[in-house]
Amino acid sequence: MGPGRCLLTALLLLALAPPPEASQYCGRLEYWNPDNKCCSSCLQRFGPPPCPDYEFRENCGLNDHGDFVTPPFRKCSSGQCNPDGAELCSPCGGGAVTPTPAAGGGRTPWRCRERPVPAKGHCPLTPGNPGAPSSQERSSPASSIAWRTPEPVPQQAWPNFLPLVVLVLLLTLAVIAILLFILLWHLCWPKEKADPYPYPGLVCGVPNTHTPSSSHLSSPGALETGDTWKEASLLPLLSRELSSLASQPLSRLLDELEVLEELIVLLDPEPGPGGGMAHGTTRHLAARYGLPAAWSTFAYSLRPSRSPLRALIEMVVAREPSASLGQLGTHLAQLGRADALRVLSKLGSSGVCWA
């Protein structure tokens, strides 16, 4: 009994509910003005029905949002006539009835300010066709009168919608930028965390025969061809010795006087006025460490009382205490000085003698 009674109650409520086109605020011959929040007269907006035997629909065919649900006029029902253009039809043969619309029970009493009633429009129906079928009312010329003055409410939708579109676009661009930043960070960060000074002959654990040292060693004026291939073949072996020097400070070289003297003999000399171009001297090494050419010129002016290489190492250690021997090995490899790399590897060798 309980579910059946609830279902019956719901059906009764649906039957008593007003149709969707009926206004919840105004009487039958009025319509709700959503802009002014009041009830306006259908007659004051559309004028009298333009064709004989037509009357106003309920609420002029407008809903409470100001949208047209049906045309404002409809043909009188059977036995009803309206020859004088009244608001509603009346029984044929009787006098025209002028209704006095009033708000229903519970409806708002607010009414809009009265306006002049427009003149009666021209009836588009021909004398030979005094009426049109009800199925054609929506597309008939008479029904088009209802659309002469649409409500301006829908025109305000786009300006209110524009800030939301701009906000969505900005949020989308921000999310894309964040995702790109995260992607680049994940791609580049592991490379930065890897050893910033890779050793010659080793690229990802595989011997590399295309290091800059090969091109420099085979260039004119560097070394003889036989010595070039001999020293280039030593690079993979030297890399194992240099790998132990990766974390050792560069200042250690100042204490290893024997190794330092050998490097001075190899790197400090420059060719005379008639010599060829020098490759991989102390002057080039200073440029790798970011020192200006004026500093190199001043350091070379102190020869022979002071070695430019020793002055360079002291300058780098003072300016960057974290400088390592591995960084020096990388610069020597980029300059193509395999002979200097062989001398530097003595600091990492344990009882190994190089011929």
Swiss-Prot record:
Which residue spans belong to the Extracellular compartment? 23-163
Q: What domain of life does the native source organism fall in?
A: Eukaryota
Kindly list the places in or outside the cell where this protein is found, as annotated in its UniProt entry: Cell membrane
Q: Which InterPro entries match?
A: DEATH-like_dom_sf, IGFLR1
Membrane topology, as annotated? Single-pass type I membrane protein
TM regions (residue ranges)? 164-184
Disulphide connectivity of cysteines? none
Q: Which residues lie on this side of the membrane: Cytoplasmic?
A: 185-355
Residue spans of biased composition, Low complexity class: 132-144
* Upregulating conditions: Up-regulated by the pro-inflammatory cytokine TNFA and in skin upon tissue inflammation.
* Residues annotated as signal peptide: 1-22
Q: Where is this region: Disordered?
A: 120-147
A GO cellular component annotation here is:
nucleoplasm
* Keywords carried by this UniProt record: Cell membrane, Membrane, Receptor, Signal, Transmembrane, Transmembrane helix
Question: What is its biological role?
Answer: Probable cell membrane receptor for the IGF-like family proteins. Binds IGFL1 and IGFL3 with a higher affinity. May also bind IGFL2.
Q: What is this protein called?
A: IGF-like family receptor 1
Q: Which organism is it from?
A: Homo sapiens (Human)
- Gene symbol here is IGFLR1
